[in-house]
Regions:
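Bacterial N-terminal signal peptides
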Residues: 1-6
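Proline/Glycine/Serine-rich low-complexity intrinsically disordered segments
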Residues: 11-278
């Protein structure tokens, strides 16, 4: 799938409604006092973003078959901020093909939530983070706890998926909590729903959507947090560029900072996460 990035007419209205429905809570990742240089991008003939269609609400195809999602709207906003609306394109590929396509010059930037690793840094250039994905607790609504923060879970059973960064993070951050491990997210959430554990600790994005799903049956709600850790959860979501993309990465950093400061980044976030992650 391949499309030009023309901004949809309804975008501003959706963002305005989200602003009313939820308080903004997107962490600020760019210091207001920081001045980021913006290279001249006027000679760049086109800016080709690569993404996928299997990571809702970040990138997916809508009911009309068009690319949609947080990343699609972010790409449009970045292009507008850089004055490159008519030069921007976006193409969807299978996730497994993104790195090879970028190295082969089939695109200029990957906007698909790729996790930064030391190995990838040897092959690609990355922008600054535009979003951090936190860990959160979730509790059953009928479970009585002696407080409103994580201390209320001390000496209590809290479920977590075995062998994950969240298990290591739970043990490191909260040694007084009794971790109960599960092999899968499904068995973890089933145990929480059946009140076999007092709470669970996992990825906030997955928990947020589960609490609103029919499967949860309004049993549970997010509790305390958010908890962020580069050591356990990584650097956050960034844009991945080819090895010669340093100048473009600097330009995108400058544009991301501008979107953060003028509120546009938060508008896009609230459109797709009206209940918040933080």
């Amino acid at each position: 799938m391949f499309v030009l990035l023309a901004a949809p007419a309804q975008a501003q209205g959706l963002a305005g409604q989200a602003q009313i429905d939820a308080a903004g809570d997107l962490p600020v990742l760019f210091d207001a006092r920081e001045r980021l240089a913006r290279p001249d991008v006027s000679e760049i003939l086109r800016l080709r973003f690569l993404t996928t269609t299997d990571f809702p609400p970040f990138n997916f195809t809508d009911q009309t078959g068009r690319l949609a999602g947080f990343h699609i709207d972010l790409a449009r906003a970045l292009c507008a901020e850089l004055g490159m609306e008519t030069k921007c394109q976006i193409q969807a590929l299978p996730y497994a093909q993104l790195q090879d396509a970028l190295e082969a010059g089939q695109g200029d930037a990957v906007l698909a939530g790729v996790a930064v690793t030391a190995a990838l840094r040897q092959r690609f250039v990355f922008s600054r983070p535009y979003m951090l994905l936190p860990a959160r607790f979730i509790r059953h609504r009928e479970t009585q706890l002696p407080g409103g923060d994580a201390a209320a879970l001390f000496d209590r059973p809290v479920g977590v998926i075995a062998g994950t960064a969240h298990e290591m993070m739970l043990k490191a951050f909260f040694p007084d909590i009794k971790p109960v491990t599960f092999e899968t997210r499904e068995t973890l959430l089933a145990a929480l729903k059946d009140r076999k554990v007092d709470a669970a600790f996992a990825d906030a994005l997955q928990l947020s959507f589960w609490t609103q799903s029919p499967a949860a049956a309004n049993c549970c709600r997010l509790f305390d947090g958010p908890y962020l850790s580069e050591k356990f959860l990584g650097e956050g979501m960034t844009i991945m560029l080819g090895p010669q993309g340093g100048t473009l990465a600097t330009a995108l950093d400058s544009a991301l900072a501008a979107l953060s400061r003028n509120g546009r980044l938060e508008e896009i976030y609230l459109r797709y996460f009206p209940s918040g992650l933080y």
